[in-house]
């Protein structure tokens, strides 16, 4: 299959992966309305073309948390990467490291912190949930510190798991799930050989290290699901802020008031995110939520954004809407599943090239020059009637 654009990786991944894995990464919550709007809303943001601007000295470089980035992109924390490619977290981290951008290791990675961190030169970021088992949280933070992780990404939009109906149909969950997954695996030989046989162990590496025993998909659904904490409040984050002396980013912000709370709390950054449409269906897309949040806290805190970003044009759009940096999730996972480290490396090259074209034709020589002036119009005039009341409720 010819890969000429980032979108080609999705089709390739669907062919290679057993359905339970493809649909787990591809799907969203409930009817997947927000999942669709994330992509569609962002694609509708019109860039303002400018000409004859002498763009010969264009630069994508930026700085975030005193780290130099080759472009305003980081790889998002995505669980179970090691089920999509052989030791997938290591391969993705190496690709990000080679490109000069951060890699974020998920709490529920297959490869543990101690396997990924030594494989790269750049300090990686680490993502953590608020869980009932505070002992696990402290253990994970201590290990992340010891491994030299530079930034903590704290995910707060999962006090309870979202309902992902696709998983029951695909075999990730539901009746006879284990047998269905086995039958799917044996009918996808490329994945079965590369990951199923040669990618072992398929533990939840960070959790296994804490529990002192092997773990697997059932623990992902069981132990982790039972440990999400619906009683979470800002107060529960205070001990973590005291313990972690590096940059701390709050992931899962969709409302300007929550963004202001993050500033008051003392966070170093926020991620405008709806968890890729995987938590609460019907909330605003990140693209629609971002401008009001940027109006509220731009300059007071670093603003990152994810959900719906599929190519370099989308990166430029998110920056113009108010983000300082974006996180890639599904986009890099499709590439990882298709061709491992080489696939992610090629994806990042494609995104960089697309960004350069977009910046050249909008007259932005640097990331700081990508502003609302780079857009034809704001999102407000484009809101469907059904979303207008929601947008009003989210206005600063």
UniProtKB/Swiss-Prot annotation:
MF GO annotations: FMN binding; L-lactate dehydrogenase activity
Catalyzed reactions per annotation: (S)-lactate + A = pyruvate + AH2
Keyword terms, alphabetized: Cell inner membrane, Cell membrane, Flavoprotein, FMN, Membrane, Oxidoreductase
Entry membrane topology: Peripheral membrane protein
Annotated positions binding substrate: 24, 129, 164, 278
Subcellular location, record wording: Cell inner membrane
Coiled coil: none
Active site, UniProt feature: 275
Source taxon at top rank: Bacteria
Enzyme class: oxidoreductase
Residue positions binding FMN: 106, 127, 155, 251, 306-330
Required cofactor(s): FMN
Gene3D superfamilies xrefs: Aldolase class I (3.20.20.70)
Pfam families named among the record's database cross-references: FMN_dh
Signal peptide: none
GO BP annotations, alphabetical order: aerobic respiration; lactate metabolic process
A GO term from the CC aspect: plasma membrane
InterPro entries on file: Aldolase_TIM, Alpha-hydoxy_acid_DH_FMN, FMN-dep_DH, FMN_HAD, FMN_hydac_DH_AS, LldD
Role summary: Catalyzes the conversion of L-lactate to pyruvate. Is coupled to the respiratory chain.
NCBIfam families: L_lactate_LldD (NF033901), PRK11197.1 (NF008398)
Protein name: L-lactate dehydrogenase
């Amino acid at each position: 299959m010819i890969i000429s654009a980032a979108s080609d990786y999705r089709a390739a991944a669907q062919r290679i992966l057993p359905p339970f894995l493809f649909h787990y990464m591809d799907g969203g919550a409930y009817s997947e309305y927000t999942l669709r709007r994330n992509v569609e809303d962002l694609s509708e943001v019109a860039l303002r073309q400018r000409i004859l601007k002498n763009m010969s000295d264009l630069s994508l470089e930026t700085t975030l948390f005193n780290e130099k980035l080759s472009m305003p992109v980081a790889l998002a924390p995505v669980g179970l990467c090691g089920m999509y490619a052989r030791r997938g977290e290591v391969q993705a981290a190496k690709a990000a490291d080679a490109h000069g951008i951060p890699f974020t290791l998920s709490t529920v990675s297959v490869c543990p912190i101690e396997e990924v961190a030594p494989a790269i030169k750049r300090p990686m970021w680490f993502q953590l949930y608020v869980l009932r088992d505070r002992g696990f949280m402290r253990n994970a933070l201590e290990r992340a510190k010891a491994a030299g992780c530079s930034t903590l990404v704290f995910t707060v939009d999962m006090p309870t798991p979202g309902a992902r109906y696709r998983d029951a149909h695909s075999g990730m969950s539901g009746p006879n799930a284990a047998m269905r997954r086995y039958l799917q695996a044996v009918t996808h030989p490329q994945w079965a050989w590369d990951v199923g046989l040669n990618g072992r162990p398929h533990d939840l590496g960070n959790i296994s290290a804490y529990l002192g025993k092997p773990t697997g998909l059932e623990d992902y659904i069981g132990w982790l699901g039972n440990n999400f904490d619906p009683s979470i409040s800002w107060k529960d984050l205070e001990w973590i802020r005291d313990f972690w002396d590096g940059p701390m980013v709050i992931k899962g912000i969709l409302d300007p008031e929550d963004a202001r709370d993050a500033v008051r709390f003392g966070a170093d950054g926020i991620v405008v995110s709806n968890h890729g449409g995987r938590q609460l269906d019907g909330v605003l897309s990140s693209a629609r939520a971002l401008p009001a949040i940027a109006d509220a806290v731009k300059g007071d805190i670093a603003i990152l954004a994810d959900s719906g970003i599929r190519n370099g044009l989308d990166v430029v759009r998110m920056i113009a809407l108010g983000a300082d940096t974006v996180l890639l999730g599904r986009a890099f996972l499709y590439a990882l599943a298709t061709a491992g480290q080489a696939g992610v490396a090629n994806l990042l090259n494609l995104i960089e090239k697309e960004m350069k074209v977009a910046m050249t034709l909008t007259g932005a020589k640097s990331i700081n020059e990508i502003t609302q002036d780079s857009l034809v119009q704001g999102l407000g005039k484009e809101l469907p009637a059904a979303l207008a009341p929601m947008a009003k409720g989210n206005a600063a």
